[in-house]
Amino acid sequence: HPRVRRQRQMCIRDSYYRTRMTHTQAVSQIARGIAEGLKLNLYLTEAIALGHDIGHTPFGHQGERTLNDILRGKFDIIKNIKLFEKTNYFGGFKHNYQSLRVASLLEEEYTEICGMDLSFQTLEGMIKHTKLKKNEFMLEQFTNDNSANEHLHFEQVFCSTLEGQVVAIADEIAQRGHDLDDALSSGAMQFEDFQKYLTVKKMKELADIVNRVNDDIIAMNHNHRRFVDENELRNSRTVSAIVSYFINDVIRYSAVKINKYDYSEFEDNDYRVSKEIISFSETAATLNKYLETIITSKVINSPEVSLFDNNAHTIVKGLFKAYYNNPRLLHKGTQRKLYINLRNVSQNVVDFEYGNYEIIKEEFDLITGYDFNNDSTSELAKEYYEKRCVLVRIICDLSLIHI
């Protein structure tokens, strides 16, 4: 999907970086492997996996954090933002909710309906692949289906399909593999240092896996096998072996839980699961958490990543501020979207393409600058309150496409 193809996820050096597309491909592959091992619906699994990050910002999670901070009033950009926050009207920015918005509202695939016409099972898997922020978002900003709240089952934080739960854990496994690969390939962590981290008792299973990979390469050297880049091969095989370990662990542990699940309860619950069934074993969960801690200290907190995050923050914040302060900078197609969305909340809408320049300027000044501290109850205040909310979401949509 074009929304994920050029979005950098993490940057260590210019010649080595990962994008949302490579991450999505990895999640899809891992999820299919788990789903196949558990005899689940491969089509649903892949649909969720391929769509789970289409609402993500560029610059990895830093882009998401910056937009979230803007919408929650940490910067003086959106006028009267604190009044909006009291009602949780903005709530913040989360890429999983934005994925729902992209799939349900933004994409134009059909003449009859908005969005991509995905099943509720697919949409639920997309929005629940990461943590929810319940009661902080107004769902009508993200879908035009009035029954979405019922069918997305926000009463439980995990997915009501096993396929959705599979994608959530596949995302976790892929992230761990990516981060370890980045750490080793960039030189932020040497292979020997990684081996030392695994000498603690609780990491014995992973240590055995890593040592076997290293022993295999040494054995091939003794057999006069020559490698173009031995370190790169060792790193690649290590990451692959660790990812395979987690995949097999999830399949084995989850299969036991599936077999114990009361099928009559599943039938009575409209073929939805009411428990989190797809998971790591206790041992694998500990190993996963330890790996995350290592990588955070060696990579995420590194000066290179901090510089990248700082630049990302500056770009996202600067663009949002520029578009908010002067919406006429918005692309013609985006102004058309803004016009259409404003028509949904008010009949008093200016044609931004063919309207009078002074009238357009006055309208934008009111949308971005109307002071609700002086007037928060009149019909005019309510109108521009709604219009400002629309503009803010449209700018967030724009950041996903053009940065």
Per-range role (PLM):
Residues 38-45:
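Glycine-rich phosphate/pyrophosphate-binding loops
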Residues 13-17, 27:
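Sequence context of c-type cytochrome heme-c attachment sites
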Residues 1-8, 12, 399-402:
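Single conserved hydrophobic/aromatic residue that forms the stacking wall/gate
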Residues 23-26, 312:
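Phosphate/oxyanion-binding active-site loops and adjacent basic polyanion-contact surfaces
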Residues 215-390, 400:
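C-terminal subdomains that position terminal phosphate/3'-OH groups for nucleotidyl transfer/ligation
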Residues 46-51:
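Short alpha-helix carrying the canonical HExxH Zn2+-binding catalytic motif
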